[in-house]
């Protein structure tokens, strides 16, 4: 519990610094948010009257902090927290996240109360992810002799580094990154505690999963967590690769029929989520909508990504997007170094499924998606944070210095990014 209290203290300190920066960021480059602020002026006045604080203090908090979180995608989220869907593309806009906030019976009918509820839930999820990462690190590396003596410190440092994640202010705003990461880390943790590492990867093993029934349940729950994470952010579909990996290990290498079926059921939950989300939009729009309804695989998600956001192979590779590639470059470099570190320098076989997912994410971001979002969406995977933490606990002065410089960069990036976000400047 002592380590958890340390994590909480660092978390509160860092969030406080972020909010101070937001408060003192002078003006917004894009003033379109003022239209929303003016539209919900009465909602703001209602909040001011409900708070038991002097008016000037309450108004200062709302005007200088909360108003500055009405930027970029938070504009869409905050609208959906309160209002019904108006446009087609909103159906694929992190559908489960905004529905969760909308369904919570707090602040109903008030724009500002729902916005602040979204921010509160986002920060709770961020803290929860830090704590899960602490226990996940213990579980993932406890069988590795390379980390036995420093496992507690390694786990704590990994969680602290996650607090200063390059995702930064997006884990504080009412974005979907924090809840997505929470359920993603939970899924990896539940999967990891379910696997019998004493026998795993041995060809003649009779046990792929631990024998007690509770571990069969936790393994199935790991698939449930991925399904929820996918409903929050589509990129979590990549986590399904873990269960395909397990199917290979359980069925082909270990020849365990029972646990092979469990891997199919656990991973199959993600498939059910995909079918359900696509069927829902198809039932609403098709066949009258035409266009994407007539595709071989009718998917509003795929259509919206390509039609509204120009997502596609090499679509983002242009001179105008060079700055966006530069924004993502540190995350790309750290991810590639993580692969090298955990395959060559400190090989940990348990990490292979996570590295596969991370590799797929990297390829997708660089070649298909808006590459700058890699900085924030990569927060649903722990590999990069483990790499920096591993450097930190190393006996090598060079490695330790590298880790220190990386953390300094993360802190500096967070401070700059927070100010840019509050000023409605890229990257988004």
UniProtKB/Swiss-Prot annotation:
Gene Ontology molecular function: alpha-1,6-mannosyltransferase activity; glycolipid mannosyltransferase activity
According to UniProt, this protein's pathway is: Glycolipid biosynthesis; glycosylphosphatidylinositol-anchor biosynthesis
Keyword set for this entry? Endoplasmic reticulum, Glycosyltransferase, GPI-anchor biosynthesis, Membrane, Transferase, Transmembrane, Transmembrane helix
Compartments where located:
Endoplasmic reticulum membrane
- What enzyme class is recorded for this protein? transferase
Q: Does the keyword Lipoprotein apply?
A: no
Cellular component per GO, a single term: glycosylphosphatidylinositol-mannosyltransferase II complex
Membrane topology is: Multi-pass membrane protein
**Cystine bridges: which residues?**
none
Recorded hits in Pfam families, A to Z, give: Mannosyl_trans2 (PF04188)
InterPro entries, per the entry = PIG-V/Gpi18
Biological-process GO terms, alphabetical: GPI anchor biosynthetic process
Regarding protein family, the annotation reads:
Belongs to the PIGV family.
Q: What is the designated name of this protein? A: GPI mannosyltransferase 2
By which gene is this protein encoded? GPI18
């Amino acid at each position: 519990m002592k380590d958890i209290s340390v994590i909480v203290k660092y978390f509160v300190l860092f969030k406080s610094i972020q909010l101070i920066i937001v408060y003192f960021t002078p003006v917004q480059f894009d003033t379109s948010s003022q239209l929303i602020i003016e539209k919900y002026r009465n909602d703001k006045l209602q909040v001011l009257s409900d708070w038991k604080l002097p008016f000037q203090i309450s108004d200062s908090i709302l005007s200088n902090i909360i108003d500055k979180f009405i930027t970029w995608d938070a504009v869409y989220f905050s609208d959906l927290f309160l209002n019904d869907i108006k446009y087609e593309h909103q159906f694929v806009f992190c559908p489960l996240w905004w529905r969760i906030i909308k369904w919570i019976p707090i602040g109903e009918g008030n724009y500002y109360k729902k916005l602040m509820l979204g921010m509160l839930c986002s920060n709770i999820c961020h803290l929860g992810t830090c704590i899960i990462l602490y226990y996940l690190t213990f579980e993932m590396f406890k069988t590795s002799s390379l980390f036995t003596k420093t496992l507690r410190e390694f786990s704590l440092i990994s969680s602290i580094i996650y607090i200063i994640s390059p995702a930064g202010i997006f884990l504080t705003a009412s974005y979907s990154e924090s809840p997505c990461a929470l359920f993603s880390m939970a899924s990896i943790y539940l999967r990891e505690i379910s696997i019998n590492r004493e026998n795993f990867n041995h060809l003649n093993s009779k046990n792929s999963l631990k024998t007690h029934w509770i571990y069969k349940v936790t393994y199935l729950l790991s698939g449930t967590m991925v399904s929820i994470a996918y409903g929050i952010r589509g990129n979590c579909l990549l986590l399904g690769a873990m269960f395909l990996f397990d199917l290979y290990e359980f069925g082909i290498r270990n020849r365990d029929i029972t646990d092979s079926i469990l891997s199919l059921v656990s991973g199959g939950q993600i498939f059910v989520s995909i079918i359900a989300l696509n069927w829902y939009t198809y039932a609403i729009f098709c066949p009258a909508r035409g266009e994407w309804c007539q595709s071989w695989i009718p998917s509003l998600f795929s259509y919206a990504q390509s039609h509204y956001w120009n997502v596609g192979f090499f679509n983002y590779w242009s001179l105008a997007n060079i700055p966006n590639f530069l924004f993502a470059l540190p995350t790309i470099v750290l991810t590639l170094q993580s692969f090298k570190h955990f395959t060559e320098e400190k090989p940990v076989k348990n990490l292979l499924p996570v590295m596969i997912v991370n590799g797929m994410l990297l390829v997708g971001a660089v070649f298909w998606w808006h590459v700058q979002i890699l900085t924030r969406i990569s927060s649903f995977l722990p590999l990069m944070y483990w790499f920096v933490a591993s450097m930190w606990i190393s006996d090598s002065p060079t490695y330790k210095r590298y880790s220190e410089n990386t953390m300094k960069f993360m802190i500096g990036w967070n401070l700059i990014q927070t100010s840019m976000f509050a000023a409605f400047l890229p990257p988004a």
